[in-house]
């Protein structure tokens, strides 16, 4: 992660501001601006955690933040420990510790045994700019808290980012949800990720959502979720165009709108609108392009040279063919 200091801006700043609020500090509003109030909150966190209180989020502070961001810690059992006392020490619940450690026997803890201890805060934050890196961390955090969820990689984006899927349930009826086909619509990714967290927690607690018992749904159906189909485009919108992007010069040429990527870019990193790159009605959509002022790669509505020309749409199409959605 980048080093954050006074004057820094962007998604990483929002992330630490949101985290600091959740763990009892006051960084000011979650606005992505590293001002004096945020700096002071960072200093207080550093003092409380034995770090140099310089108000700079460098490698050591990021490392300490990382434990909270991924949502759990590992703990080595000592003589006299009980799961109840461990859960109280970490401000979490006994149920959360038991869920994260399937098969553990509370009455037969072994000295030296390493367990996973979830923190008492949610993994998925919904008040931040939701980049691929944040989603990747959240998936790992959710898998640690809820080992019964299934996580897989269906494919990779143009730039090699994983196209994750998460499976919830074991029933015969299969349902598929996906998000962030369009880069500007990145908010659908944290929506789905928060659903995953709530659904998994409901299963662990044997509770209901809107009157539906989650364990009953779990046994009746299987929900497959691909939360971010277009991670390259999402990061372009949220983090801006970086010099080391292999499409740097082409992206500048393709975005001929005069507006920043954060306001106009829906396509993948090769300027293809993924929603218009599927075989269904591809020819009809292609015929519309001239009237829309589209003559090649760009921010939106270019369907590519052929159906499924992009690795992201190939991944989604192949995934659906393997299931009975």
Where does each model-flagged region fall?
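Alpha-helical interaction/regulatory segments in DNA maintenance proteins
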Residues: 53-69
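Short glycine- and acidic-rich boundary segments immediately preceding or forming the N-terminal edge
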Residues: 3, 96, 118-159
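Extended, structured, electrostatic nucleic-acid-contact surfaces
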Residues: 20-29, 43-52
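Short beta-strand-to-loop junctions in surface cap/lid or active-site-entrance loops
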Residues: 164-173, 180
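Conserved hydrophobic/aromatic packing and binding residues within compact polymer-binding modules
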Residues: 42, 97
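Active-site/substrate-binding loop(s) of hydrolase catalytic cores
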Residues: 172, 186-325
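Primarily a LysM-type cell-wall glycan-binding module
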Residues: 8-18, 31-36, 67-91, 113, ...
């Amino acid at each position: 992660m980048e080093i954050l200091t006074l004057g820094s801006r962007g998604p990483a700043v929002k992330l630490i501001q949101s985290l600091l609020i959740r763990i009892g500090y006051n960084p000011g509003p979650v606005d992505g601006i590293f001002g004096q109030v945020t700096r002071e909150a960072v200093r207080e966190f550093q003092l409380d955690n034995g770090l140099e209180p310089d108000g700079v989020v460098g490698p050591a502070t990021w490392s300490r933040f990382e434990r909270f961001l991924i949502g759990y810690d590992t703990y080595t059992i000592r003589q006299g420990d009980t799961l109840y006392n461990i859960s109280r020490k970490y401000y979490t619940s006994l149920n959360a510790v038991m869920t994260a450690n399937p098969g553990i026997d509370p009455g037969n803890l072994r000295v030296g045994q390493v367990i996973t201890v979830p923190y008492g805060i949610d993994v998925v934050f919904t008040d931040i700019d939701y980049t691929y890196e944040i989603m990747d961390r959240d998936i790992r955090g959710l898998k640690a808290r809820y080992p019964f969820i299934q996580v897989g990689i269906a494919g990779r984006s143009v730039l090699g980012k994983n196209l994750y899927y998460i499976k919830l349930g074991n029933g015969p009826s299969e349902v598929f949800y996906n998000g962030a086909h369009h880069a500007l619509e990145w908010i659908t990714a944290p929506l789905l990720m928060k659903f995953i967290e709530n659904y998994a927690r409901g299963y662990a607690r044997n509770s209901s959502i809107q009157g539906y018992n989650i364990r009953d749904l779990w046994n009746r159906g299987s929900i497959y979720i691909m939360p971010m189909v277009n991670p390259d485009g999402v990061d372009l919108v949220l983090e801006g165009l970086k010099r080391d992007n292999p499409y740097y010069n082409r992206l500048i040429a393709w975005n001929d709108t005069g507006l920043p990527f954060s306001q106009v870019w829906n396509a993948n990193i090769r300027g293809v609108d993924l929603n218009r790159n599927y075989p269904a009605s591809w020819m009809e959509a292609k015929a519309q392009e001239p009237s829309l002022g589209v003559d090649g790669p760009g921010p939106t509505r270019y369907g590519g040279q052929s159906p499924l020309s992009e690795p992201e749409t190939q991944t989604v199409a192949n995934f659906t063919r393997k299931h009975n959605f």
